[in-house]
Amino acid sequence: MSSFTHFNDQGRAKMVDISDKKATVRTAIACSSIVVTKEIYDKISHNEIGKGDVLAVAQIAGIMAAKRTSDIIPMCHPLLLKGVDVSFDWKQSDEQYRLLIEVKVKTEGSTGVEMEALTAASATALTVYDMCKAVDKGMIIGETYLLEKTGGKSGDYTRKS
């Protein structure tokens, strides 16, 4: 494992200088999920949540979060993103309804987009919670994790199952 690079000679936090790094195509895929009741699942599926189309709003929130990651994660560089795609898939078992969230982010630049993908996945799940909390506050936001990344000096990464 490499050493931490976000500290200066005095041991204080710094933003890493990436000006000498080569610009390459970089991608990241992050996942999250939220478990909801059958009632919420039905209301989302039939667009009956009072605040509006939950998945459309959550999708936009995820895209906005990816674009604004450097505003909330202190050491992230502002990036010109080339694309952000938020997708959903429902998984049901018994009376448990899990909304799976997958976010793909792409750029061509000097640093990766892992944090943008992770931030987007988190914000997407949080937005679903916010829009549905009037129906039930017992929703559970699941694990948020990096599934895959490509490009950059550290090479490609794929999460092992």
From Swiss-Prot:
GO terms for molecular function: cyclic pyranopterin monophosphate synthase activity. The active site is at 130. Keywords: Lyase, Molybdenum cofactor biosynthesis. It comes from Bacillus anthracis. It comes from the Bacteria. Catalyzes the conversion of (8S)-3',8-cyclo-7,8-dihydroguanosine 5'-triphosphate to cyclic pyranopterin monophosphate (cPMP). It catalyses: (8S)-3',8-cyclo-7,8-dihydroguanosine 5'-triphosphate = cyclic pyranopterin phosphate + diphosphate. The keyword Lyase applies. HAMAP family: MoaC_B (MF_01224_B). Its EC number is 4.6.1.17. It holds the Pfam family MoaC. Belongs to the MoaC family. It is an enzyme of class 4 (lyase). Substrate binds at residues 75-77, 115-116. One of its GO terms (biological process) is Mo-molybdopterin cofactor biosynthetic process. SUPFAM superfamilies: Molybdenum cofactor biosynthesis protein C, MoaC (SSF55040). Homohexamer; trimer of dimers. This is Cyclic pyranopterin monophosphate synthase. The keyword Lyase applies. InterPro entries: MoaC, MoaC_bact/euk, MoaC_sf, MoCo_biosynth_MoaA/MoaC, Mopterin_CF_biosynth-C_dom. Pathway: Cofactor biosynthesis; molybdopterin biosynthesis. The lineage of its organism: Bacteria, Bacillati, Bacillota, Bacilli, Bacillales.
